[in-house]
């Protein structure tokens, strides 16, 4: 009888561990490089999730880069496309497929927000969007942080996008549940 109880406990804890949510918060990211210039980089890896632009710039020969951006009210860091004149979706590729992904974001006033989930074949499997990110209610208010979630059986990567030229959309935190 004790072997059966042991096996049940083992199965329950293994199943629970597999379903634990993983949180990526970008707090390890450096805001500035050694020479005090804005820290721009082609790729960021945290907790096995690889962040990079979905494609290279098409309107210029510039190298596509990401950067960290600080939410002034909270001091938290987020990741954003560093290409102000050519907004490019930011892609986050998971080390193993996920079944649910939630991204906390904030952005320019009125910026549209799109979150798309893709499987390992590049097929769109879920989509969430807002025509306009929530804005401040008064000039002294902090920029609101909002969340978007996508769900599908085997999400290989997500992309977040929406900004037009000169706008920004920052991922403040990414939470995913592996399969």
Regions inferred by a protein language model and the residue ranges of each:
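Terminal and domain-boundary regions
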Residues: 1-3, 17
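Bacterial Sec-dependent signal peptides at the C-terminal "C-region" and cleavage site
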Residues: 12-20
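Surface-exposed, well-ordered secondary-structure segments
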Residues: 19-179
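Sec-dependent N-terminal signal peptides
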Residues: 4-13
């Amino acid at each position: 009888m004790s072997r059966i109880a042991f096996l049940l406990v083992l199965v329950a804890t293994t199943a629970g561990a597999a379903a634990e949510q993983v949180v990526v918060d970008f707090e390890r990211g450096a805001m500035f490089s050694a020479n005090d210039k804005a820290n721009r980089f082609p790729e960021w890896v945290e907790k096995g999730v690889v962040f990079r632009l979905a494609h290279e710039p098409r309107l210029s020969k510039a190298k596509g880069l990401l950067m960290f951006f600080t939410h002034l009210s909270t001091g938290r860091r987020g990741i954003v496309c560093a290409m102000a004149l050519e907004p490019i979706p930011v892609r986050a590729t998971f080390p193993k497929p996920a079944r649910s992904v939630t991204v906390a974001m904030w952005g320019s006033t009125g910026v549209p927000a799109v979150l798309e989930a893709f499987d390992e074949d590049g097929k769109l499997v879920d989509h969430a969007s807002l025509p306009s990110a929530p804005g401040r209610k008064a000039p002294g208010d902090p920029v609101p942080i909002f969340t978007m979630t996508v769900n599908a059986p085997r999400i290989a990567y997500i992309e977040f996008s929406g900004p037009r030229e000169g706008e920004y959309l920052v991922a403040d935190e990414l939470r995913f549940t592996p399969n």
